[in-house]
């Protein structure tokens, strides 16, 4: 109940401190819930708003918070029976070179393949379906029922070695100067709730903050995902449709 909700003025490290306090109590009393949702969302950042943390500092705090969470769980008595799924809430229409819908995703478990990059095309629904299968619950909708579970990320041999969070390699309190690229526009944007800022404009502000004021952000790429149909199959489907109409 004391876990801070959305507020970019509260560090994700503070959020993890609150979560850790409760998690240690669960370790003592054995009452850890079967399923938890943990939001550490300050990697949204406030762009280059003067005086706020830089995008680099916000993301570094977020990374360290996640690392501390994984370290705590992997060193706990629950590790052998736990999987941690990490996903952005929204791809934000970013300048990904393959498709603007793509998001980085991580699965951390004693039963995931370590050091493995799974290039299978999964969806958010597929991640939900994987959680449902682990928990032994039915799909919530037709979308997760039909989605590909993340089978390829897992193995049947456990590696119980714990993880250790790496220390931050940059200043976690780095602030935006008044003359940062996009500072004036960032001051006008609404950060009181998630994803209220125009995504492409905000992406460009962050891009220039990280890559340099004179750098050019690539335009978003939007790929089409279609089911390939053999010509013979298509003709058979048309014939079947005509028979049904008759």
Where do the model's predicted regions map?
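N-terminal pro-sequences and low-complexity stem/linker regions of secreted or lumenal proteins
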Residues: 1-246
């Amino acid at each position: 109940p004391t876990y801070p909700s959305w507020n970019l003025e509260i560090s994700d490290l503070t959020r993890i401190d609150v979560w850790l306090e409760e998690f240690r109590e669960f370790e003592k009393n054995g009452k850890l819930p079967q399923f938890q949702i943990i939001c550490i969302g300050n990697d949204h950042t406030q762009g280059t708003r003067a005086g706020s943390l830089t995008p680099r500092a916000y993301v570094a705090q977020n990374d360290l918070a996640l690392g501390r969470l994984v370290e705590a769980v992997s060193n706990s008595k629950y590790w052998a029976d736990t999987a941690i799924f990490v996903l952005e809430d929204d791809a934000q229409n970013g300048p990904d070179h393959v498709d603007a819908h793509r998001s980085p995703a991580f699965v951390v478990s004693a039963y995931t393949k370590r050091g493995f990059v799974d290039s299978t095309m999964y969806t958010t629904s597929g991640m939900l379906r994987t959680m449902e299968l682990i928990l032994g619950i039915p799909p919530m909708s037709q979308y997760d029922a039909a989605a590909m579970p993340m089978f390829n990320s897992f193995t049947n041999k456990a590696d119980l070695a714990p993880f250790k969070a790496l220390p931050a390699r940059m200043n976690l309190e780095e602030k935006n100067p008044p003359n940062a690229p996009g500072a004036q526009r960032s001051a006008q944007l609404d950060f009181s709730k998630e994803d209220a800022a125009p995504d492409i404009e905000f992406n460009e502000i962050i891009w220039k903050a990280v890559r340099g004021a004179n750098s050019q952000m690539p335009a978003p790429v939007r790929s089409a995902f279609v089911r390939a149909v053999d010509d013979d199959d298509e003709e058979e489907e048309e014939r079947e449709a005509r028979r049904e109409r008759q």
